[in-house]
Amino acid sequence: MHTIKPPPASHYDEMLAWTGAGPAGVQVQRQLQSSGGQVQTQTATVGPRDHYAPYSDWLTRTAEQSLTQRRAQADLLFRRIGITFTVSGDDSGTERLIPSDVIPRIITADEWSYLERGLTQRVTAINHFLADIYHEQKILKAGLIPREQIEGNAQFQTKMIGVKVPHDTYVSITGVDIVRNNDGKYYVLEDNLRVPSGVSYMLMNRKMMMRLFPELFLKQTVRPVEHYPALLLQTLREATDIDNPTVVLLTPGRYNSAYFEHTFLAQQMG
């Protein structure tokens, strides 16, 4: 019996399923903290989730030294390209490398289909909500949301009341922060609707994985993501009624925490 400690910045726990018993698993101990603050040690059998099995087999066969070297190569690559970010609230303004993880978070096709439907529904609802707030305000008149909660919000723009936006679309791009809890269900932490950032890190991380771990992509059917900038450009062009519009990506400058993303997306969109 031993205690498994996941490596830093790793999806190790995500890969494992606490099965309770089973010959294929490994006996481990984990510590659980109750709502009252008491810490209990639980013994259980752990093994890879079904959709992680092929990756787990590869990870078992791969030498630790090889993984360490590839992780170092990833850090060196990111540093050379300048893929850094600053943490909000960090007074020192220290730039940090994007964290890389040799254990990817694997989402099955069925899970992604479920998430896609839910996110589409959520963004549609947000657009309907904003359209109502700036026009008929039925939700306020019905008392479903206190009027002062809307009108007292710093982001509420009175100048937008009655303004017709193209295609009734108030939110064209959104970054929805999602987590999966211990019960296996997905939860939304927050909706980033104004200037969502972070997609460039995902795109570069995928590119890095394909470069340093090509054998993984030969054995797995992984959906592509590199077409995102083209979809973004199409979305921005469709946000106006002007024929053949010119799209411009503005940035506060190189000292902004998301400057790498601004330059990356501008270059990718041409």
Located regions from the model:
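Preference for protein termini
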Residues: 1-270
